[in-house]
Amino acid sequence: MSYVNRHLIHQINQSARLIAKKANEQLEPFGLYSSQWSVLYCLRTIGPMTQKEIWSYLNVEAPTVTRTIKRLEENGWVQRRQGEDKREKLVVLTKEAEKKYEEINVKMLKFEEELLADFRDEDKEAFSHLFRMFLQQ
Protein backbone atom coordinates (compact mmCIF):
# COMPACT_ATOMS: atom_id res chain seq x y z
CA MET A 1 0.00 0.00 0.00
CA SER A 2 1.43 3.36 -0.99
CA TYR A 3 1.94 6.30 1.34
CA VAL A 4 -0.83 8.20 -0.44
CA ASN A 5 -3.36 5.40 0.06
CA ARG A 6 -2.52 5.06 3.75
CA HIS A 7 -3.04 8.73 4.50
CA LEU A 8 -5.50 10.02 1.92
CA ILE A 9 -8.65 9.74 4.07
CA HIS A 10 -6.86 11.45 6.95
CA GLN A 11 -5.72 14.26 4.65
CA ILE A 12 -9.22 14.70 3.25
CA ASN A 13 -10.66 14.81 6.77
CA GLN A 14 -8.06 17.33 7.96
CA SER A 15 -8.65 19.48 4.88
CA ALA A 16 -12.41 19.43 5.43
CA ARG A 17 -11.95 20.50 9.05
CA LEU A 18 -9.64 23.34 8.05
CA ILE A 19 -12.04 24.52 5.35
CA ALA A 20 -14.97 24.40 7.82
CA LYS A 21 -12.96 26.38 10.37
CA LYS A 22 -12.09 29.06 7.82
CA ALA A 23 -15.66 29.09 6.50
CA ASN A 24 -16.92 29.63 10.05
CA GLU A 25 -14.71 32.71 10.28
CA GLN A 26 -16.30 34.07 7.09
CA LEU A 27 -19.81 33.31 8.31
CA GLU A 28 -19.38 34.69 11.83
CA PRO A 29 -20.60 38.22 10.94
CA PHE A 30 -23.89 36.66 9.82
CA GLY A 31 -24.27 34.57 12.96
CA LEU A 32 -23.88 31.33 11.01
CA TYR A 33 -21.68 28.26 11.04
CA SER A 34 -20.64 26.25 8.00
CA SER A 35 -23.07 23.45 8.88
CA GLN A 36 -25.92 25.96 8.89
CA TRP A 37 -24.70 27.53 5.66
CA SER A 38 -24.77 24.06 4.07
CA VAL A 39 -28.47 23.77 4.86
CA LEU A 40 -29.23 27.28 3.59
CA TYR A 41 -27.21 26.64 0.42
CA CYS A 42 -29.03 23.35 -0.09
CA LEU A 43 -32.46 24.95 0.31
CA ARG A 44 -31.61 27.85 -1.99
CA THR A 45 -30.10 25.59 -4.64
CA ILE A 46 -32.63 22.76 -4.56
CA GLY A 47 -35.68 24.42 -3.04
CA PRO A 48 -37.94 23.37 -0.17
CA MET A 49 -36.98 19.98 1.24
CA THR A 50 -38.00 17.64 4.02
CA GLN A 51 -35.54 17.10 6.84
CA LYS A 52 -34.94 13.59 5.55
CA GLU A 53 -34.08 14.93 2.10
CA ILE A 54 -31.68 17.41 3.68
CA TRP A 55 -29.80 14.86 5.77
CA SER A 56 -29.69 12.44 2.86
CA TYR A 57 -28.32 15.09 0.52
CA LEU A 58 -25.76 16.39 3.02
CA ASN A 59 -24.75 12.90 4.23
CA VAL A 60 -25.35 13.95 7.83
CA GLU A 61 -27.13 12.08 10.59
CA ALA A 62 -30.76 12.98 11.21
CA PRO A 63 -30.32 14.33 14.79
CA THR A 64 -27.60 16.71 13.59
CA VAL A 65 -29.83 18.13 10.87
CA THR A 66 -32.75 18.37 13.30
CA ARG A 67 -30.65 20.47 15.71
CA THR A 68 -29.27 22.63 12.90
CA ILE A 69 -32.72 23.32 11.47
CA LYS A 70 -34.07 24.10 14.93
CA ARG A 71 -31.34 26.72 15.43
CA LEU A 72 -31.89 28.15 11.97
CA GLU A 73 -35.62 28.34 12.66
CA GLU A 74 -35.07 30.04 16.04
CA ASN A 75 -32.83 32.61 14.35
CA GLY A 76 -35.30 33.35 11.55
CA TRP A 77 -33.44 31.71 8.67
CA VAL A 78 -35.89 28.89 7.90
CA GLN A 79 -39.42 27.85 8.64
CA ARG A 80 -41.27 24.59 8.39
CA ARG A 81 -44.35 24.37 6.21
CA GLN A 82 -46.94 21.72 5.58
CA GLY A 83 -46.01 19.50 2.65
CA GLU A 84 -48.38 17.81 0.23
CA ASP A 85 -48.84 15.02 2.75
CA LYS A 86 -50.14 16.20 6.14
CA ARG A 87 -47.37 14.25 7.86
CA GLU A 88 -44.71 15.91 5.73
CA LYS A 89 -43.02 19.13 6.82
CA LEU A 90 -40.99 21.08 4.31
CA VAL A 91 -38.12 23.30 5.38
CA VAL A 92 -38.00 26.57 3.45
CA LEU A 93 -35.96 29.76 3.58
CA THR A 94 -37.69 32.73 5.17
CA LYS A 95 -38.09 35.98 3.25
CA GLU A 96 -35.38 37.49 5.47
CA ALA A 97 -33.01 34.62 4.63
CA GLU A 98 -33.72 35.10 0.93
CA LYS A 99 -32.76 38.77 1.28
CA LYS A 100 -29.50 38.01 3.10
CA TYR A 101 -28.57 34.97 1.03
CA GLU A 102 -26.96 36.78 -1.88
CA GLU A 103 -24.66 38.83 0.36
CA ILE A 104 -23.52 35.70 2.17
CA ASN A 105 -23.14 33.76 -1.06
CA VAL A 106 -20.95 36.48 -2.57
CA LYS A 107 -18.73 36.37 0.51
CA MET A 108 -18.52 32.57 0.38
CA LEU A 109 -17.73 32.55 -3.34
CA LYS A 110 -14.92 35.03 -2.71
CA PHE A 111 -13.70 32.84 0.15
CA GLU A 112 -13.70 29.80 -2.14
CA GLU A 113 -11.86 31.72 -4.83
CA GLU A 114 -9.18 32.85 -2.36
CA LEU A 115 -8.89 29.37 -0.86
CA LEU A 116 -8.30 27.82 -4.28
CA ALA A 117 -6.25 30.67 -5.77
CA ASP A 118 -2.99 28.71 -5.77
CA PHE A 119 -4.49 25.74 -7.60
CA ARG A 120 -4.44 25.44 -11.37
CA ASP A 121 -7.78 25.07 -13.14
CA GLU A 122 -6.79 21.50 -14.06
CA ASP A 123 -6.23 20.71 -10.37
CA LYS A 124 -9.63 22.13 -9.45
CA GLU A 125 -11.27 20.07 -12.20
CA ALA A 126 -9.48 16.96 -10.93
CA PHE A 127 -10.61 17.66 -7.34
CA SER A 128 -14.16 18.15 -8.50
CA HIS A 129 -14.12 14.99 -10.58
CA LEU A 130 -12.66 12.86 -7.79
CA PHE A 131 -15.08 14.17 -5.18
CA ARG A 132 -18.07 13.54 -7.48
CA MET A 133 -16.83 9.98 -7.99
CA PHE A 134 -16.38 9.54 -4.26
CA LEU A 135 -19.87 10.84 -3.47
CA GLN A 136 -21.46 8.50 -6.01
CA GLN A 137 -20.18 5.39 -4.23
Swiss-Prot record:
InterPro entries: HTH_MarR-typ, WH-like_DNA-bd_sf, WH_DNA-bd_sf. It holds the Pfam family MarR. PROSITE patterns: HTH_MARR_2. One of its GO terms (molecular function) is DNA binding. Keywords: DNA-binding, Transcription, Transcription regulation. Signal peptide: none annotated. The keyword ATP-binding does not apply. SUPFAM superfamilies: Winged helix' DNA-binding domain. This is Uncharacterized HTH-type transcriptional regulator YwoH. It comes from Bacillus subtilis (strain 168). The gene is ywoH.
